[in-house]
Design a protein with these regions (language model features):
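Solvent-exposed, acidic/flexible segments
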Residues: 55-59, 116, 128-137, 151-155
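Post-HExxH zinc-binding segment in Zn-dependent metallohydrolases
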Residues: 150-189
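Boundary at the C-terminal end of the N-terminal hydrophobic targeting segment
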Residues: 24-26
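Bacterial N-terminal signal peptides that target proteins for export
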Residues: 2-11
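Auxiliary, metal-adjacent structural segments of Zn-dependent hydrolase domains
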Residues: 28, 33, 37, 41-120, ...
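Pan-zinc metallopeptidase signature
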Residues: 3, 195-227
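Active-site recognition of the HExxH zinc-binding catalytic motif
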Residues: 137-149
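Bacterial N-terminal signal peptides
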Residues: 12-22
Length: 227
């Protein structure tokens, strides 16, 4: 399934897993280790693109991840994070120890939160060293949860988007497939489900419907009426 559908909702609260409320950001970006980036992302190139991404947060890897979404099915997500949402402001992204928010969140990969009109995405610190391409795919999923509502249809679409974007990333940047990282394991699992379903959401939908974490979700939510 090629995901060309543009969802009209703006980025919001229900993320893949959970929520939080507060955050702070340093003025200068945090540098990361070279293995995270494709070769084109030299220090000079990153310095060049930083002004376009610095408002999302302090970690340089987010700038690279968002830039890697260019020429993928994740462009809508990229644009939403950069400010094409109801708040008309960039979504703030941060690595967090999620257990400090709630012990139940310790193993979660990502959280989303809407506080007033401000929008946030938090990524588990265990993924801080993951390849930027895997973080890009995760962000493509997160950016589809755009209000306080969630549903099985919405999760199915978001997981499928993540798989499609990861597939695109590997075509553009095959060096992103560093299997020693848990986030890459996650992305490859989704990619296999996508391939098994002949690039439809068939098996991803089955995984969503069987996920105990989603057992109380309604079938549909605004903007997601096809399951």
């Amino acid at each position: 399934m090629i995901l060309n559908k543009l969802i009209t909702k703006t980025l919001g609260v229900i993320s893949i897993f959970a929520l939080t409320t507060t955050m702070t950001f340093a003025a200068e970006p945090n540098m990361t280790v070279p293995h995270q980036y494709p070769k084109k992302y030299t220090p000079e190139y990153i310095k060049q693109i930083t002004p376009g991404y610095k408002d999302v947060g302090k970690d340089e890897v987010f700038y690279v991840a968002l830039d890697m979404l260019k020429d993928t099915e994740g462009m809508f997500s990229r644009n939403a994070i950069l400010g094409n949402n109801l708040s008309e402001k960039p979504v703030r992204i941060e690595f967090r120890n999620l257990s400090e928010i709630n012990a139940e969140y310790a193993t979660f990969d990502a959280l989303g939160w809407k506080k007033g009109k401000k929008l946030y995405i938090y990524i588990n610190t265990k993924h801080k060293d993951a390849p930027a391409g895997a973080i890009a795919a995760l962000l493509a999923h997160e950016a589809l949860h755009q209000d306080e509502y969630n549903s099985l249809a919405e999760e199915t679409y978001a997981w499928t988007m993540e798989a499609v974007v990861w597939n695109d990333i590997l075509k553009l940047y095959p060096e992103s497939n560093q299997e020693q990282y848990p986030l890459v394991t996650r992305e490859n699992t989704l990619k296999r489900l996508l391939e098994k379903g002949n690039y439809t959401n068939k098996y991803i939908k089955k995984a969503v419907l069987s996920n105990s974490g989603y057992k109380n979700l309604p079938s549909y939510s605004p903007g997601f009426d096809n399951l």
